[in-house]
From Swiss-Prot:
Residues 105-124, 439-495 are annotated as: Disordered. Residues 73-77 are annotated as: Interaction with membrane phosphatidylinositol 4,5-bisphosphate. Keywords: AIDS, Capsid protein, Host cell membrane, Host cytoplasm, Host endosome, Host membrane, Host nucleus, Host-virus interaction, Lipoprotein, Membrane, Metal-binding, Methylation, Myristate, Phosphoprotein, Repeat, RNA-binding, Viral budding, Viral budding via the host ESCRT complexes, Viral nucleoprotein, Viral release from host cell, Virion, Zinc, Zinc-finger. This is Gag polyprotein. A zinc finger (CCHC-type) spans 385-402, 406-423. It comes from the Viruses. HIV-1 lineages are divided in three main groups, M (for Major), O (for Outlier), and N (for New, or Non-M, Non-O). The vast majority of strains found worldwide belong to the group M. Group O seems to be endemic to and largely confined to Cameroon and neighboring countries in West Central Africa, where these viruses represent a small minority of HIV-1 strains. The group N is represented by a limited number of isolates from Cameroonian persons. The group M is further subdivided in 9 clades or subtypes (A to D, F to H, J and K). A motif (Nuclear export signal) lies at residues 16-22. Residues 8-43 are annotated as: Interaction with host CALM1. A motif (Nuclear localization signal) lies at residues 26-32. Late-budding domains (L domains) are short sequence motifs essential for viral particle budding. They recruit proteins of the host ESCRT machinery (Endosomal Sorting Complex Required for Transport) or ESCRT-associated proteins. p6-gag contains two L domains: a PTAP/PSAP motif, which interacts with the UEV domain of TSG101 and a LYPX(n)L motif which interacts with PDCD6IP/AIP1. The modification Phosphoserine is found at S144.
Amino acid sequence: MGARASVLSGGKLDKWEKIQLRPGGKKKYRLKHLVWASRELERFALNPNLLETVEGCRQIIRQLQPSLQTGSEELRSLFNTVATLYWVHQSIQVRDTKEALDKLEEEQNRTQQKTQQGKADKGVSQNYPIVQNLQGQMVHQALSPRTLNAWVKVIEEKAFSPEVIPMFSALSEGATPQDLNTMLNTVGGHQAAMQMLKDTINEEAAEWDRMHPVQAGPIPPGQIREPRGSDIAGTTSTLQEQITWMTSNPPIPVGEIYKRWIILGLNKIVRMYSPVSILDIRQGPKEPFRDYVDRFFRVLRAEQATQEVKNWMTETLLVQNANPDCRTILKALGSGATLEEMMTACQGVGGPGHKARVLAEAMSQVTNSAVMMQRGNFKGQRRIIKCFNCGKEGHLARNCRAPRKKGCWKCGKEGHQMKDCSERQANFLGKFWPLNKERPGNFLQNRPEPTAPPAESFGFGEKITPSLRQEMKDQEQGPPLTSLKSLFGSDPLSQ
């Protein structure tokens, strides 16, 4: 520990131990914080001996600062410790860690301003086609072959995909109409697309002439003429006129106007080269959500719509056209979820790991339900029990403490029990079952009588014996043949 604690000594160590960890807090820096910082530097593959000097602390700060946004709490604590130690080495008094960080930010801002001022003093930037020479005159600097080569390479590799438009905008920054025409003329193939671009430029030039008519009369001395549509397109204007328009006071940005026309035509070409509609972009069953989002926004860039419409497409169609697994997750996030939250939530959906996890969760729910049912914790619909003796709920009649009710528990009448009660027990004819054990009225009361004449009336059959004749006479004395007593018990014709 001795070697690690040798970072500070004497008066510097006393100043170190007077600095508070937090504004208004009681805890202060101690020697153990320097020991911890040395160990952390070794863990981050940095030399702990850098803590002993001002320049060493500055190098550590320069290494750790870019990682603060995504770093851990240990990394931030190490940065705060080194920043505080940086001011102790310079014998500059700070009260707490926050004051040390504020002073460090002020110092970095002053250094950055000096650097920018030094670059400005060296001369005008050479990144734009129109530059100022040593005599103070605005002159034109032609596009470099490197810029033209980059543009041609983009067209050859990407054809007219949506990313061509921002690439063209970046390469033509500050260009004159003559420079823009040079870039368009370097495109060898895709002549059909270039003809479409020329038609769009001619339409916009005609619209410009209609909105900006020529002033009547001669041009006053010392003034330049107003540019026409063909002048903006670079066909009827010279390079010097274009520079004059772009550098006059107030300036007429003919280069930016022409660039806007070209981008409008490129949008139409991109739309033609990307025939897929945003409505047709759907996520496959096993397609990762990240790849689906890439395809979605690639086609969205080619859509000819305002930014508000594109935002609506992103909020609605991105969720609607996802596969069922991702759509369930995205709807659970709500409508205010960011794209980062969506991609984080759907990461790994559709793969074998996700399917195994879903299956495990389903099996876990089934197992938990079975365990709860076995333990008697299943909360189903409880059956309400009611006492037939007192009429109250919560107990049965055999457990009732009230006096025993006489008679039937169902209808309240005496003379029969509840099992023999006919209350609300009617047959399908609407009549109650009789209390006696007779058959209901819709059943046969007795064996039906045959209505056919006797066999001897036809002159064939067995010989009639005296006993058989006596039996037939007894049957003739029975009820009339037209009686309905065989079917219904109370026949009015039999009375």
